[in-house]
Amino acid sequence: MFSLSGKTALVTGASGGIGAAIARQLHAQGATVVLSGTREAALQELADSLGERAHIAVANLSDPAEADGLVAKAEAVAGAPLDILVNNAGLTRDTLAIRMKDSDWSQVMTVDLESPFRLARAALKGMLRRRAGRIISIASVVGTTGNAGQANYAAAKAGIVGMSKSLAQEAGPRGVTVNVVAPGFIETPMTDVLPETVREKLIGSIPLGRMGNTGDVASAVVYLASDEAAWVTGTTLHVNGGMAMV
Amino acid sequence: MSDIADKVKKIVVEHLGVDESKVTPDASFIDDLGADSLDTVELVMAFEEAFSVEIPEDAAEKIATVKDAIDYIEKQKAA
């Protein structure tokens, strides 16, 4: 089950915690992975640790031209057409709306919403022709629930859901599926520094009684990327320990 | 047959996987050649690339037959 042998996957934001976990699990299922991000050394280190079937493609997704060109670049380094696109790269510029600068808004929109569209558009051209493909975008529970201090991020992540549903309708007749994974609170270096009382309160709001880990998110991506998920499209798979049942 | 007509025909055969004999000037992409709406968009994009022309959305909507495509591209190329 869930073999990705012979498939080629591009993972953006692969130098981050969740992105690296996604790349590792796709690779473990047999996929050839192209790791993308801005930090070349970190990407190379991950590629080296994976060994065979791992390539890197450095790209800064805040630059529209680099976003537009990344799929072609990934296919060139992998030497194969792209079967799986994982839009994982993202950034946050958290602050309350009344203090939010235009640049806080636009940077998040460009990287978290516009670049996934650019990548999906480029990937779809080949996928539609080949009548196969998987596009999986990483959103967030806050795209559904909202979150104080994240008007920009929540809007971008909600946008990912609407975009993916539209693309799923366009690409469905060609057997290409488009889905979203929406993580809740995931253990990362960022959440490690939270005070213990805040952590406890956070965990208290999660029925499954713990924070998520990056592997929880990666497993959901593997499922959606697999042949077994062939009849699942336009959906959002919430991976949040039951914190928000939507 | 003009070079443009020849090339259009070739693109249609390639993209829709239909027999060359079916690609007559009056053949409708959707009604006669089995194209769906996504096919027609892909065809228009293939024409744009092959002939280095831009086919705006409102013009693309009017291209229903092989002849429509040839006429439109010939007009663009002549302009």
From Swiss-Prot, chain B:
The record places domain Carrier at 2-77
The GO biological-process annotations, alphabetized, read as:
lipid A biosynthetic process
Q: Which Pfam families match?
A: PP-binding
What's noted about post-translational modification?
4'-phosphopantetheine is transferred from CoA to a specific serine of apo-ACP by AcpS. This modification is essential for activity because fatty acids are bound in thioester linkage to the sulfhydryl of the prosthetic group.
Name which cysteines form disulfide bonds. Answer: none
Alphabetical UniProt keywords: Cytoplasm, Fatty acid biosynthesis, Fatty acid metabolism, Lipid biosynthesis, Lipid metabolism, Phosphopantetheine, Phosphoprotein
Pathway of action = Lipid metabolism; fatty acid biosynthesis
| Major location category of this protein | cytoplasm
Q: Name the Gene Ontology molecular function terms of this record.
A: acyl binding; acyl carrier activity
Compartments (UniProt record): Cytoplasm
The answer on whether this UniProt entry bears the keyword Isomerase reads: no
Q: Residues where O-(pantetheine 4'-phosphoryl)serine occurs?
A: S37
One GO CC annotation? membrane
Which family does the similarity line name? Answer: Belongs to the acyl carrier protein (ACP) family.
Q: What does this gene product do?
A: Carrier of the growing fatty acid chain in fatty acid biosynthesis.
Protein name per its UniProtKB record: Acyl carrier protein
Q: What is the lineage of its organism?
A: Bacteria, Pseudomonadati, Pseudomonadota, Alphaproteobacteria, Acetobacterales
Q: Which gene encodes it?
A: acpP
